[in-house]
């Protein structure tokens, strides 16, 4: 007994292990790398394409020699955007084996200015702006050293490092104030170290030792019974995180501040949280999940569901000694709405893995790149940093190194591993004509990973190779550029199987794909 069926899928998804699918409604993947989802604008579809890499913006050629702005013995630990009197400025924190440094970088002119030298080596970096209008202050800390930097001119002149004589980094008990997690809340600078959370005098981010019980603007500190891991302003209060729990510190007219009861959601480290959309997302290593604080109707918060169940396999690879290397970033640009988690899970130390939550489509994908330490938005553009400063989504390579892409589809078995499936017609892909669509497809049949898989190179027969490099120009009145809505159809190999795992991948330079639909026509299902 047999039957014939067919389907066409317009909707690709990300990594799904909890509710995976290979059906007409959606095709998900068990794993992927350097691919992204996009709206095809056809039939409410979501397509699949290889993602772009990055380029170094801290190097340039001079007399056929490659020159780097960053000294050869230093690595970039932190990237910061500070706005000084309306002017956006780029700050880099670097470390060598012996010292840390702060630089102001002007990308347009390949200029780098040393701001602070001989800082302690900690491998950490945090910073924030204290905006006052008449004097905007950028405050930096690496956990040991705290520096205040500002500009007194709207012109693009060198920044000024505040004199230590004007800074009172001792608290009301004469203890030194230092630590991480710098944030601004209630017009004060907040900073934590261990179980102590300090706050500056209101309106004065440089003073921590002014105390007067009759003055509500006084500086002070709050001591907790557990170590603090992160802090973040949320809903008119300050969210204070521990490893496995959190509390809200709220304003109080009588006592200045008061604490709510503990919530079960904790945060792994001071950069493992980010505000995106209307929610505060944070990675809890004790639960190996990404949770969020969500605002409910009455204005209170509630703990959201774990959105990272499908990538728990990757999160289990995070070593407890590397927790402080996690970086979370809200990425909202012209064509992106994502939450990035830079996680120390790569088995190869020369590479890094970014787990990306596609906020619009509610899907996870993975990005593999050269080793980086930080990610940041500067002037509405996405940057990363390691040995150099990189601008993302600008190239087919990662600073001239090719790193392959793949999309390993969820296994197709039509709800049964015991029936034989025969493709009477080759499966077909509709691909975007603006891409090269030169890639490989791999078939693994019946879960047999010991047998060599069937691999075939796919080459689209579009006209892109003819007129791609003419995009944006008109050489005569008859010239018409091939629009992105033009599609081409490529055929995949036919196959006979009980269960089939399909993988699309690239393995050499100038390979890429952009898939709109996958169609399987006349699939015969036979009882055996």
Segments the model singles out, each with a brief description of its role:
Residues 77, 128-130, 180, 187, ...:
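Beta-propeller and closely related beta-sheet repeat lectin domains
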Residues 96-99, 143-144, 153, 194-195, ...:
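Surface-exposed loop/turn positions within WD40 beta-propeller blades
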Residues 152-181:
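Asp-box/WD-like beta-propeller blade repeats and closely related beta-sheet repeat scaffolds
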Residues 1-134, 264-279, 284-528:
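Beta-sheet repeat architectures centered on beta-propellers
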Residues 100, 238-263:
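Surface-exposed extracellular loop regions of Gram-negative outer-membrane beta-barrel proteins
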Residues 177, 181-207:
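Carboxylate/His-rich catalytic cores and anion/metal-binding grooves
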Residues 91-94, 138-140, 188-193, 237-242, ...:
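Short beta-strand motif characteristic of blades in beta-propeller domains
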Residues 119-120, 163-173, 211-223, 304-323:
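Surface-exposed loop and turn segments in beta-propeller and other repeat-based domains
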């Amino acid at each position: 007994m047999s039957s014939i069926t067919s389907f066409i899928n317009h909707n690709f998804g990300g990594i799904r292990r909890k509710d995976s699918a290979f059906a007409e409604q959606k095709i998900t993947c068990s794993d992927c790398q350097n691919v992204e989802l996009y709206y095809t604008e056809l039939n409410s579809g979501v397509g699949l394409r290889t993602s772009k890499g990055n380029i170094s913006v801290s190097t340039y050629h001079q007399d056929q020699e490659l020159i780097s702005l960053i000294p050869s013995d230093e690595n970039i630990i932190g990237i910061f955007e500070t706005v000084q009197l309306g002017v956006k400025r780029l700050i880099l924190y670097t470390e060598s084996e012996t010292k840390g440094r702060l630089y102001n970088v002007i990308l347009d002119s390949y200029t780098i200015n040393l701001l602070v030298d001989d800082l302690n080596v900690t491998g950490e970096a945090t910073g924030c702006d204290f905006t006052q209008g008449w004097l905007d202050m950028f405050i930096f800390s690496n956990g040991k050293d705290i520096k205040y930097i500002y500009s007194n001119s709207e012109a693009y002149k060198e920044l000024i490092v505040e004199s230590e004589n004007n800074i009172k980094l001792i608290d009301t008990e004469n203890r030194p104030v230092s630590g991480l997690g710098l944030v601004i809340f209630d017009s004060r600078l907040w900073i934590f170290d261990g179980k102590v959370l300090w706050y500056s005098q209101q309106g004065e981010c440089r003073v921590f030792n002014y105390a007067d019980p009759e003055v509500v603007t006084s500086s002070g500190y709050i001591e907790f019974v557990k170590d603090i891991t992160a802090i973040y302003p949320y809903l008119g209060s300050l969210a204070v995180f521990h490893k496995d729990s959190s509390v809200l510190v709220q304003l109080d007219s009588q006592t200045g501040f008061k604490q709510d009861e503990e919530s079960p959601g904790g945060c792994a480290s001071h950069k493992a949280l980010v505000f995106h959309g209307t929610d505060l997302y944070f990675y809890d290593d004790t639960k190996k999940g990404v949770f969020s604080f969500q605002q409910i109707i009455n204005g209170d918060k509630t703990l959201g569901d774990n959105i990272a169940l499908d990538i728990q396999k990757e999160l289990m690879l995070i070593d407890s000694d590397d927790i402080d290397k996690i970086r979370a970033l809200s990425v909202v640009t012209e064509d992106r709405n994502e939450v990035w988690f830079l996680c120390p899970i790569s088995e190869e130390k020369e590479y890094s893995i970014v787990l990306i939550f596609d906020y619009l489509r509610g899907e996870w994908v993975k990005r593999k790149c050269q080793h980086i330490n930080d990610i940041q938005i500067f002037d509405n553009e996405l940057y990363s940093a390691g040995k150099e400063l990189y601008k993302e989504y600008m190239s087919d390579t990662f600073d001239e190194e090719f790193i392959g892409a793949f999309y390993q589809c969820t296994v197709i078995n039509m709800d049964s591993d015991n029936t034989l499936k025969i493709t009477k017609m080759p499966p077909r892909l509709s691909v975007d004509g603006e891409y090269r669509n030169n890639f490989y497809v791999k078939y693994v049949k019946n879960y047999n990973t010991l047998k060599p898989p069937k691999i075939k190179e796919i080459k689209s027969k579009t006209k892109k190779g003819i007129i791609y490099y003419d995009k944006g120009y008109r050489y005569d009145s008859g010239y018409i550029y091939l629009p992105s809505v033009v599609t081409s159809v490529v055929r995949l190999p036919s196959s006979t199987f009980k269960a089939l795992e399909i993988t699309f991948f690239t393995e050499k330079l100038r390979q890429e794909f952009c898939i709109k639909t996958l169609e399987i026509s006349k699939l015969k299902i036979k009882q055996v």
